[in-house]
Structure formats: C-alpha cells, structure tokens
Regions:
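Coupling/hinge elements of helicase-like and P-loop NTPase modules
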Residues: 90-103
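Short arginine-rich
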Residues: 52, 86-93
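GIY-YIG nuclease catalytic motif and its immediate N-terminal context
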Residues: 1-50, 63, 70-86, 103
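Generic low-complexity segments that are intrinsically disordered, proline-rich and/or Lys/Arg-biased
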Residues: 22, 58, 91-92
Length: 103
C-alpha cells in the first residue's frame, strides 16, 4: 500500500518546514528513480531536516529530491515502515528480503 499522503514534496528545508509536521509517522525519500529510503520517527519534520544536514548516505542511489509522509501512532509506525520497505524495496534500507519473511 503506498503512502496514504502520496503527494511528493521538494526535499528542501523550506518545504520541510512548511509541509512536514512535528508529529509521529513514516516518511519516504525519493528521486527520479523512485523511493530510496523509508523511515519512521516521532518527529517527521525534525528527522527530515536532519537528513538534509547529514552526509548523503544515499549517494550510490542518487540524492533525494522529494519526500512524502503519513502520520501514524508510535505503535503503528514501525509495522507500517516495514510494510512499505517490503512493498517499495528502497535501496537505502538495505535488503528487504529478511523483512518479507515477517509478513
């Protein structure tokens, strides 16, 4: 199942501050090739801004140019992240085959 809020936003600080809430949820980073990373956090806005400031661990897969997110409770977000990793198989999350066994 894709992101419930699938509207892709530009992966820039101004867009993150304007669009991403400081709330619990799951987020995805994308580029022209597709989804490159899916994460979960208790503060979507802060985590996305932190990704901008960190060295780019996704360099081999291309820099992120967009993001999307969906709100979810702390109890739901880890399961939702795993579900999305299995579905999208983003290269930044490593090999999703081990997660497929859990479903």
């Amino acid at each position: 199942m894709p992101f419930r809020n699938c509207f892709a936003r530009t992966f820039k600080a101004a867009a993150i501050r304007r669009e991403a809430p400081p709330s619990s949820g799951v987020y995805g980073l994308s580029n022209a090739r597709g989804w490159i990373y899916v994460g979960e956090t208790d503060d979507i806005q802060a985590r996305l801004l932190a990704h901008l400031e960190e060295p780019n661990p996704f360099a081999a897969h291309g820099a992120p140019t967009g993001f999307s997110f969906e709100l979810s409770s702390p109890g739901e977000r880890i399961a939702r992240q795993r579900q999305m990793i299995v579905e999208f198989d983003p290269p930044g999350n490593g090999d999703s085959r081990s997660m497929r066994k859990a479903f």
